[in-house]
From Swiss-Prot:
Task of the protein: ATPase subunit of a proteasome-like degradation complex; this subunit has chaperone activity. The binding of ATP and its subsequent hydrolysis by HslU are essential for unfolding of protein substrates subsequently hydrolyzed by HslV. HslU recognizes the N-terminal part of its protein substrates and unfolds these before they are guided to HslV for hydrolysis.
Quaternary assembly: A double ring-shaped homohexamer of HslV is capped on each side by a ring-shaped HslU homohexamer. The assembly of the HslU/HslV complex is dependent on binding of ATP.
Protein family (similarity comment): Belongs to the ClpX chaperone family. HslU subfamily.
CC annotations in GO: cytoplasm
UniProt keyword terms in alphabetical order: ATP-binding, Chaperone, Cytoplasm, Nucleotide-binding
Organism phylogeny: Bacteria, Pseudomonadati, Pseudomonadota, Gammaproteobacteria, Enterobacterales
Binding site for ATP: R21
Keyword hit for Ribosomal protein: no
Subcellular location: Cytoplasm
Organism encoding this protein: Buchnera aphidicola subsp. Schlechtendalia chinensis
Name this protein carries in UniProt: ATP-dependent protease ATPase subunit HslU
Keyword Cytoplasm recorded: yes
């Protein structure tokens, strides 16, 4: 959770601080792959969202300053 909140904070600091709405968009981006591809993995009942998963899905986006996706 800390890593997710930190990602939202970094994006808020980089563009415009829109508070919790930014956290919502970060969570939405993080869950996008699971939402669209979970039906392909019917045998997997547990999906672990740990720091490694969060880093894999959010760090590149933040480091590349590809933040246009987070503008509401």
């Amino acid at each position: 959770m800390r890593h997710i909140a930190e990602a939202a904070w970094k994006v808020n600091e980089s563009i415009e601080n829109i508070g919790a709405r930014r956290l919502y968009t970060v969570l939405e981006h993080l869950m996008e792959d699971i939402s669209y591809n979970s039906c392909n993995n019917k045998n997997e009942l547990v999906i672990n969202i740990d720091e490694e998963y969060v880093s894999k899905h959010l760090d590149e986006l933040i480091l590349n300053n590809d933040l246009n996706r987070f503008i509401l």
